[in-house]
């Protein structure tokens, strides 16, 4: 896989912003088939920084019920499962897109 196929998007939330500022951790949504080595290599190639470590989390899908305007359930479905990567960088390194 290429680097652009591995890194899907950055995660920008209040929690990830505080982690980025305090302990220099960046959070990304990544391809479900990617492993730690591939994610680290993609970060190094795309952003020119060297990751110290990388943790991956599999986020399971959740069941959802589609409700009509009157409040009656009209269908069932589920969200997609996806993978999240926590990338730890050195204190002097920084990714500029954030």
UniProtKB/Swiss-Prot annotation:
Keywords for this protein: Ribonucleoprotein, Ribosomal protein, RNA-binding, rRNA-binding
Species the sequence originates in: Borrelia garinii subsp. bavariensis (strain ATCC BAA-2496 / DSM 23469 / PBi)
The keyword rRNA-binding is assigned to this record: yes
Single GO term (MF): structural constituent of ribosome
Pfam families reported for this sequence: Ribosomal_L23
Similarity section: Belongs to the universal ribosomal protein uL23 family.
Known role: One of the early assembly proteins it binds 23S rRNA. One of the proteins that surrounds the polypeptide exit tunnel on the outside of the ribosome. Forms the main docking site for trigger factor binding to the ribosome.
Keyword Disulfide bond attached: no
Protein name: Large ribosomal subunit protein uL23
Subunit structure: Part of the 50S ribosomal subunit. Contacts protein L29, and trigger factor when it is bound to the ribosome.
GO cellular component, one term: ribosome
Domain of life of the native organism: Bacteria
InterPro entries cross-referenced by the UniProt entry: Nucleotide-bd_a/b_plait_sf, Ribosomal_uL23-like, Ribosomal_uL23/eL15/eS24_sf
GO annotation (BP), single: translation
